[in-house]
């Protein structure tokens, strides 16, 4: 197996580790790292939670014999940071530990990094290889990449439908929906919720189903709830307004909305063709990277 093939093997392990941070690190990206000495992994780590140490720090700190680091290769799925944020620059730690070779899956498009991590390492005389499993590394963080590059949230549309294309029957308010999804798919949906930053429904879904839009069948956080309600038709006693969790209501600029609890924020945007661009811009401003649309 040549060096490039070996690099791919260890980068795949970085991706496995990085995925363990799913649902816990946003708005940061998921990142995994391994430290390799003479073909053997002697340390590994991943970014576990937003605000906590990055993957490179955890991987380096997990090495029992720090004296081996000047003989090691560090693999990391995303370019090491080069700026001060909630944690110090990972690039500086790598230089300090005298690690001679670093293999990077993909560059970080975040403006404060954007290639500067690689520059910092190379200026210190470190061999840097980039682009190993690059597409896989980008795909893992597609929500982060979309937000940084396109300056909008990544949007996931979710629905359940019958084989012949129906999603529900015609029903009066208060009538239960016909259940199409099963228990397994319901758990999967709640996993999606735990991984999303926000979840959105329209007026009809909010009125007909009175959903909670919380994460209950999977571990993790509940997303920010967003209700599109142009004409204030959603009852003020709905679950999304009364359970004390944070919700946003998007309504028209001239709509008079009833007084709601402090946990509910009312945002006024122009509806029509400008609604989606305006909504995505508002969510980007709030650092929402992944929007799940459920109805």
Residues of each region from the PLM?
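Glycine-rich beta-strand-to-loop/alpha-helix junction loops that act as flexible
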Residues: 31-32, 203-204, 294-295
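Active-site ligand-binding patch in enzyme domains
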Residues: 146-290
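Zn2+-dependent cytidine deaminase-like catalytic core
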Residues: 35-138, 224, 253-255
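Short acidic/polar active-site loop segments enriched in Thr and Asp
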Residues: 100, 289, 294
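Short, basic/aromatic recognition patches
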Residues: 6-26, 147
């Amino acid at each position: 197996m040549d060096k490039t093939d070996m690099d791919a093997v260890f980068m795949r392990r970085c991706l496995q580790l990085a995925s363990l941070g799913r649902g816990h690190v946003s708005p940061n990206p998921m990142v995994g790292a391994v430290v390799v000495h003479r073909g053997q992994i002697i340390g590994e780590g991943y970014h576990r939670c937003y605000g906590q140490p990055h993957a490179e720090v955890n991987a380096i700190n997990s090495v029992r014999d720090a004296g081996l680091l000047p003989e090691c290769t560090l693999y990391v799925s995303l370019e090491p940071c080069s700026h001060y944020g909630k944690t110090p620059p990972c690039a500086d730690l790598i230089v300090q530990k005298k690690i001679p070779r670093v293999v990077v899956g993909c560059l970080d498009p975040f403006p404060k990094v954007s290639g500067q991590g690689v520059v910092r390492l190379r200026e210190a005389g470190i061999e840097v290889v980039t682009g190993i499993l690059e597409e896989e590394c980008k795909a893992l963080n597609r929500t982060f990449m979309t937000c940084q590059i396109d300056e909008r949230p990544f949007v996931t549309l979710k629905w359940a439908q019958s084989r012949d294309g129906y999603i529900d029957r015609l029903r009066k308010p208060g009538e239960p929906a016909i259940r199409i999804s099963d228990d397994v798919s319901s758990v999967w949906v709640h996993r999606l919720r735990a991984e999303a930053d926000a979840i959105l429904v329209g007026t009809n879904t909010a009125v007909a189903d009175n959903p909670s839009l919380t994460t209950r069948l999977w571990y993790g956080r509940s997303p920010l709830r967003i209700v599109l309600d142009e004409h204030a038709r959603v009852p003020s006693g709905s679950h999304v307004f009364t359970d004390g969790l944070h919700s946003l209501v998007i309504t028209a600029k001239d709509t008079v909305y009833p007084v709601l609890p402090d946990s509910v924020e009312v945002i006024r945007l122009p509806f029509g063709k400008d609604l989606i661009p305006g909504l995505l811009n508002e969510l980007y401003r709030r650092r929402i990277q992944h929007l799940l649309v459920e109805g």
